[in-house]
Curated annotation (Swiss-Prot):
InterPro entries membership: PSI_PsaA, PSI_PsaA/B, PSI_PsaA/B_CS, PSI_PsaA/B_sf
Name this polypeptide is given: Photosystem I P700 chlorophyll a apoprotein A1
Organism: Staurastrum punctulatum
UniProt keyword Acetylation, yes or no: no
EC number: 1.97.1.12
Gene name linked to the record: psaA
GO-annotated biological processes: photosynthesis
Cofactor note: P700 is a chlorophyll a/chlorophyll a' dimer, A0 is one or more chlorophyll a, A1 is one or both phylloquinones and FX is a shared 4Fe-4S iron-sulfur center.
Protein residues bound to chlorophyll a': 674
Segments passing through the bilayer: 70-93, 156-179, 195-219, 291-309, 346-369, 385-411, 433-455, 531-549, 589-610, 663-685, 723-743
Length: 749
């Protein structure tokens, strides 16, 4: 950290009225492009319109103008999110059984959608308990509302209205900061100020505000609900906030006010700031006093972090200095030049953020079941499965997006003159070694992981179970994972002496937690089957990374096409007369990476779904625990045939037999999504010329009848066809999985 003489204060950097508001301009499709603004001559126009509408790089090369468009679009995105959230809360207020669910969250299922009887589809309104007919939802919103202290539908209405007000504010802000007071480029590039405000403001004060809400509103309300007090008898939130005596009745330290805080006698507050670990046995969720403690600690950390970077006062860190000082003995110029990349290429910035955000989303997926944060979330198996699946899919898409934008950065924004012998340059220069080694790793993982499975299938087929890899024959125990589990399970009383229980029940060493006769969470034993599946995970993830990384590292040039950078981010082939140069653009690598991402995530969510049904989820009685699939994972998941027979086929019976029941929509979606998936193959396995010939024949027939269209029909380009193909492939696959999972888990869970 360096202290300098104070630098001149940062001036307010905006341009006033830079772009006039014009409805005439907005009403003209393609107004952002000279070519598109002329209007359509062929059907390709509508595809190009969609491809380029948000590709601000193609509208202008002025970085300031691009930055303003992105900034303004973010406000539009926030407005959409607020409207969507408002709709969720409105459904909770108007069409849901939330108040009934609050009274008996174990036996009544959450529902916030009632189907109107138009052509007999009111069959979809299943009996969710508590005298309510509707569609069972698996979003986890009821549990979140309960955890935040919402007890009435009026509160949900009010929040929904608040969401619409915020949406209006965001729409106004998007217009204002583009048309009235648009920030200058220097403002977008002022990273220290941005870090300070985002860290201290968004994350720090955001967490502090949430901790405050949890202490003064959520905690007393949840405490009373847990004790069995009727929601209608509980004081309203503002009464707890304004009347300290109400809180002091539940938490005696409130009577002392802020005295313990200023006298540093903080232990006084340990009645509502705890470090217990484990789960609340009443709700099956994390202890609310633990999560309050967590948010308070996070707030302190981030508020401190938000004072670390040098702005007007000449004190603190400079990102440029930190990066340029970051040199090792083996890495040349180290991070020199990276500051310039991240302040002039928003694609590079976005790639980094997407990679981190995607990884974080997958980490969230794993914590949502192992440390369920909301009351009664853990016993709502449909919601648990949905949340895990959702967060892993989101993570997968974000990580592929990171590969896409990293490649776009290299094609459009990379400046070789400023990148000499720094880390990026060095990685690009030994890309052949990186990719060939990664390729070897993929081959090794692929042959060995599938080799173990094929060995097992062969032995099983030959009737030699004693020669299989399984927990009852040749064991391949995941010893490192078991060591990690045991270390965490032993931490309370050993390396974490102040914790009452381990961070998660899943580590083992403790009893399972059951709520209302349903298992909330139990230790998760790992065995040979998990070892085998784990190596399939390693294989699919490494292949996804291989495809994306090859696309990035060879985005500008390769031995095959040395001038690739001149062809752009997406191109079908390197022109006529150069056979074997198709499917080499950076875009094609993203296209191929998406399929492997789909492979990766599918295996992950199948593993999770079956493992939980087999070893965790179930009911508790005097005779012990009865799991949904009776612990069949350890034997079934050791062969490919077992996955097909004992998981896919055995668990598809609910969705296949759903006709005539309230789950029949899932049966239709299962069928329809299979069709959407199959439809994608028509685009993926077909050549452009085939369709062009067909179109010309059809156009000839129209000309004969004198009904020829003014806009000339054209076949999709190769890239457009692939984009349509991969979109339907993923959409069909995801919707099929969704219907399969939900029909199954709502039936048996």
């Amino acid at each position: 950290m360096t202290i300098r003489s104070p630098e001149p204060e940062v001036k307010i950097v905006v341009d006033n009225d830079p772009v006039k508001t014009s409805f005439e301009k907005w009403a003209k499709p393609g107004h952002f492009s000279r070519a598109l603004a002329k209007g359509p001559s062929t059907t390709t126009w509508i595809w190009d319109l969609h491809a380029d509408a948000h590709d601000f790089d193609s509208h202008t090369s002025d970085l300031e103008e691009i930055s303003r468009k992105v900034f303004s679009a973010h406000f539009g995105q926030l407005a959409v999110i607020f409207i969507w959230l408002s709709g969720m809360y409105f459904h909770g207020a108007r069409f849901s059984n939330y108040e009934a669910w609050l009274s008996d969250p174990v036996n009544i299922k959450p529902s916030a959608q009632v189907v109107w009887p138009i052509v007999g589809q009111e069959i979809l309104n299943g009996d969710v308990g508590g005298g309510f007919q509707g569609i069972q939802i698996t979003s986890g919103l009821f549990e979140m509302w309960r955890g935040s202290g919402i007890t009435t539908e009026l509160q949900l209405y009010s929040t929904a209205i608040g969401g619409l007000v915020m949406a209006a504010l965001m729409l106004f802000a998007g217009w204002f900061h583009y048309h009235k007071a648009a920030p200058k480029l220097a403002w977008f590039q002022n990273v220290e100020s941005m870090l300070n405000h985002h860290l201290a403001g968004l994350l720090g004060l955001g967490s502090l505000g949430w901790a405050g809400h949890q202490v003064h509103v959520s905690l007393p309300i949840n405490q009373l609900l847990d004790a069995g007090v009727d929601a209608k008898e509980i004081p309203l939130p503002h009464e707890f906030i304004l009347n300290r005596d109400l809180l002091a009745q539940l938490y005696p330290s409130f009577a002392k006010g802020l005295t313990p805080f200023f006298t540093l006698n903080w232990a006084e507050y340990s009645d509502f700031l705890t470090f217990r670990g484990g789960l609340n046995p009443v709700t099956g969720g994390l202890w609310l006093t633990d999560t309050i403690h967590h948010h308070l600690a996070i707030a302190v950390l981030f508020i401190v972090a938000g004072h670390m970077y040098r702005t007007n006062w000449g004190i603190g860190h400079s990102m440029k200095e930190i990066l340029e000082a970051h040199k090792g003995p083996l890495t040349g110029e180290g991070h020199k030049g990276l500051y310039e990349i991240f302040t002039t290429s928003w694609h590079a910035q976005l790639a980094l953020n997407l990679a981190l955000m995607g990884s974080l989303s997958i980490i969230v997926a794993h914590h949502m079941y192992s440390m369920p944060p909301y009351p009664y979330l853990a016993t709502d198996y449909g919601t648990q499965l949905s949340l895990f699946t959702h967060h892993t899919w989101i993570g997968g898409f974000c990580i592929v997006g990171a590969g896409a934008h990293a490649a776009i950065y290299l094609v459009r924004d990379y400046d070789p003159t400023t990148q000499y012998n720094n880390l990026l340059d060095r990685v690009l220069r030994h890309r052949d070694a990186i990719i060939s080694h990664l390729n070897w790793v993929c081959i090794f993982l692929g042959f060995h992981s599938f080799g173990l499975y094929i060995h097992n299938d062969t032995m099983s087929a030959l009737g030699r179970p004693q020669d299989m890899f399984s927990d009852t024959a040749i064991q391949l125990q995941p010893v490192f994972a078991q060591w990690v589990q045991n270390t965490h399970a032993a931490a309370p009383g050993f390396s974490a002496p102040n914790a009452a229980a381990a961070t998660s029940i899943t580590w083992g060493g403790s009893e399972l937690v059951a709520v209302g006769g349903k298992v909330a969470m139990s230790p998760i034993p790992l065995g040979t089957a998990d070892f085998l599946v784990h190596h399939i995970h390693a294989f699919t993830i490494h292949v996804t990374v291989l495809i994306l990384l090859k696309g990035v590292l060879f985005a500008r040039s390769s031995r095959l096409i040395p001038d690739k950078a001149n062809l752009g981010f997406r191109f079908p082939c390197d022109g006529p007369g150069r056979g074997g140069t198709c499917q080499v653009s950076a875009w094609d690598h993203v296209f191929l990476g998406l399929f492997w991402m789909y492979n990766s995530i599918s295996v992950v969510i199948f593993h999770f779904s079956w493992k939980m049904q087999s070893d965790v989820w179930g009911t508790v009685s005097q005779n012990g625990v009865s799991h949904i699939t009776g612990g069949n994972f350890a034997q079934g998941a050791t062969t490919i045939n077992g996955w097909l027979r004992d998981f896919l086929w055995a668990q598809a019976s609910q969705v296949i037999q759903s006709y005539g029941s309230s789950l029949s929509a899932y049966g239709l979606v299962f069928l329809g999504a299979h069709f959407v998936w199959a439809f994608s193959l028509m685009f993926l396995f077909s050549g452009r010329g085939y369709w062009q010939e067909l179109i010309e024949s059809i156009v000839w027939a129209h000309n004969k009848l004198k009904v020829a269209p003014a806009i000339q029909p054209r076949a999709l380009s190769i890239i457009q066809g692939r984009a349509v193909g991969v979109a339907h492939y993923l959409l069909g696959g995801i919707a099929t999985t969704w219907a399969f999972f939900l029909a199954r888990i709502i039936s048996v869970g």
